[in-house]
Amino acid sequence: MASDNDLFRVLVYDLAAAKGDIVMLPGRGEMIGGSGLAALLFAKYGEVAADALDPGQPIIFAIGPATGYFPLMSKTVAGFKSPYNGFYAESHAGGRSALALRFAGLDALVVVGRAKRPSVLVVGSRRLELLDTHYLWGADVFTTGKLLRKIAAGSSGHRSIMRIGPAGENGIGYACVNVDTYRHFGRLGLGAVMGAKNLKAVVVQGDADLPLPVDKGYAKLFKAIHEQVTSSGMMAKYHDLGTPANVLPLNELKSLPWRNMTATSDPEAAKISGEAFADELLMHNAACSGCPVGCIHIGMVREKFSDAHRFAIHQVAYDHEPNFAAGPMLGVTDPAEVLAINDMADRQGLDIISAGVALAWAVEATTKGL
């Protein structure tokens, strides 16, 4: 008979019934990481023939067995049927999501059904509640996050808020899920799946203790992994300029799409390079919980709100892919404008990569009078 250490501990929550149950599931020695667990759970709870937005389709948030125990293990895997392509999909996000699940005593959360009214699901080791939050429907992701930090109060270090914006509420096929402000479940429409379930947000409260291995071998292994990760040149690159460091090399290789892919390089690439963003707009770095790299780069967008030259400052996370979609794909070479476009898409809960590509087509079509 398998012990609890050999089993996955999964919370399965039915939004329609407003009820959840803990399921102990075998397979820990067979599945690889959060991806393996998410696939296993979709095979158990998913409906292959049903539409992606069918209430019976599950949303799965899963973590791997090393999460919480070793550095870098900071990603949660979301498994779902994609409204974008109609297939099983994975999306990965960090922030505090993975450690929050671990400190809530869970390997995975499975959400099925459709809530009667727009709702927020709050999950913790000692709390399970579905809140009627119809008043948040229509709110952007930043307003939603700000309010939920008060509504579902908890220790911010071990609390994760995964929420959608109007894009998800309206079933946009590439709506994403904002995770703790600066990270996202992007690309394949998880936001639309949450919207179809009347699920505005999931708040995970990591409110339990996490017993660590007591043998000396564990401490030595942890230290060795930490030292290897933090001393590598690749990790230094991600901490310094981040993925925007790729802009100039890609442009030189003629592999940087410009103006809806009508060109593959441009002499103005230096204006939107990683160096330019760092010199002009970078405010600070941030890190996902449990990760020593600190690869999240947060820039600033100034928004004028008074003729007397008064400005509000928005903090906007940036990476190469969002910058490419809101920059060279649109022919935009001002870093401040790139971040402003990123910020507008992010507020609505749109995947900026898909949104930028769609905008690039629209810009070219308009330019050509189509």
Residue ranges and their predicted role:
Residues M1-H92, R96-L370:
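Intrinsically disordered, low-complexity segments enriched in small residues
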